[in-house]
Amino acid sequence: MIKKLFKTENDTALFILRLLLGIVFFPHGMQKLLGWFGGYGFAGSMGFFTGQMGIPAIFAFLAIMAEGLGSLGLLTGLLTRVAAFGITVNMIVAVYMVHWHNGFFMNWSGAMTSAGKPAGEGFEYHLLAIAIGIALMIKGGGRWSLDRVISGKLK
């Protein structure tokens, strides 16, 4: 079982997918976890998720860890499948809870609702993150990953 967790191929495409998904999620995770990049930090993020969004504390904690630690796992290629799973689940929940009702498109044009409020973001970006996460869960971290190094030592 442990060998399967670390097993991956010497694939540059997987490395690129892993690295770029990690780069995209690193600032989001650090906003929630440490308050970097203008974020609210752990306490503020927990308060927002549990208070305003009504998410149970354990799931709020897991969401913050999935983005914060998951992005680090993707950047280093350590426990890539676990990191990708956390981020994929986060994105599925985000689509369901926040973005689905806004439609497909991201609204980068600043469209407004009929009530004069900014229209929310759609879910097209999230689908890409979900697809990349699923690919990484299936194939692993690829070339230049710590998983590959560990897998080689487990043989």
Stretches found by the model and what they are:
Residues 34-55, 59:
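Membrane-interface interhelical connector segments
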